[in-house]
């Protein structure tokens, strides 16, 4: 969300933003037809990665993705992989050895997309902004440590799920424990970032810095993952979910 509309310091900062960062509440207050198009078409410069909800959207009408939104949707990828890990644990506890390839592929995505890319963005750009301002330093210290611990657990999952790895009962038990530990750590980790760390960026960054960070994130995403970027990773996760029979969202609806 670009601006909440609430009387907070964060909103004061974002009101200085150029027209490209029009807030969602502001958009809702504008007429859905002519006035809305005029407001969006006023965007200038090179905005961060646009949202592509409508196929007929012109470049002038595209709504930019902010840095916190970018990081939060990447957390969505992580959440889906944690669900894959949960399904893997369920199957391992039922003496099912079949999920090993899917778990290995999931751990590879965590390594390349979450740890080597997403986590590095946080450590290089997000945490320093807060630490330099003397804000949330106790939290960023813990988050950095958890990033390191996560890499250790991912190393173990990758090693345990290779084709050459022994997959006897003790190995399966250890794998399930490592995945459970990863889930237990990163669920509160990403929740704290989404609700405390990322919102605090508005208190310590100018509108220009906020926009520049979003552009930096977009450039790095495409450099590492190609033009499709984030969507290509989402598609890979969806394929893994389908292979495990957990892609259909309706199956999670209680009766």
UniProtKB/Swiss-Prot annotation:
- UniProt cross-references to Pfam families, sorted A to Z: Hemerythrin
The protein's matches in Gene3D superfamilies, at most eight in alphabetical order, are given as: nmb1532 protein domain like
Q: Where is this region: Disordered?
A: 42-67
Classify the source by domain of life: Bacteria
Q: Name one GO cellular component term.
A: plasma membrane
> Which InterPro entries does this entry report, sorted A to Z?
Hemerythrin-like
What name does the UniProt record give this protein?
A: Uncharacterized protein Mb2018
Organism this protein belongs to: Mycobacterium bovis (strain ATCC BAA-935 / AF2122/97)
């Amino acid at each position: 969300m670009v601006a909440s509309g609430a009387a907070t310091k964060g909103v004061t900062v974002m009101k200085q933003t150029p027209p490209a960062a029009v807030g969602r509440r502001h958009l809702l207050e504008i007429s859905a037809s002519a006035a809305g198009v005029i407001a969006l078409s006023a965007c200038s410069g090179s905005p961060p990665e646009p949202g592509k909800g409508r196929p007929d959207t012109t470049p002038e009408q595209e709504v930019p993705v902010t840095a916190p939104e970018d990081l939060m949707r990447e957390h969505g990828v992580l959440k889906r992989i944690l669900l894959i890990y949960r399904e893997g644990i369920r199957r391992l506890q039922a003496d099912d050895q079949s999920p090993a390839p899917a778990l290995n592929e999931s751990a590879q995505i965590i390594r390349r997309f979450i740890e080597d890319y997403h986590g590095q963005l946080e450590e290089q750009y997000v945490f320093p902004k807060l630490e330099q301002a003397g804000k949330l330093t106790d939290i960023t210290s813990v988050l950095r440590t958890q990033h390191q611990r996560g890499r250790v657990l991912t190393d173990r999952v990758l090693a345990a799920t290779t084709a050459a790895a022994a997959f006897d009962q003790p190995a399966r038990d250890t794998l399930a424990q490592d995945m459970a530990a990863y889930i237990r750590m990163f669920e509160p980790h990403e929740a704290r970032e989404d609700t405390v760390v990322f919102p605090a960026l508005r208190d310590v960054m100018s509108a220009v810095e906020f926009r520049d960070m979003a552009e930096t994130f977009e450039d790095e995403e495409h450099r590492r993952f190609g033009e499709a970027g984030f969507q290509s990773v989402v598609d890979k996760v969806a394929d893994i979910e389908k292979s495990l029979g957990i892609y259909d969202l309706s199956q999670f609806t209680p009766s």
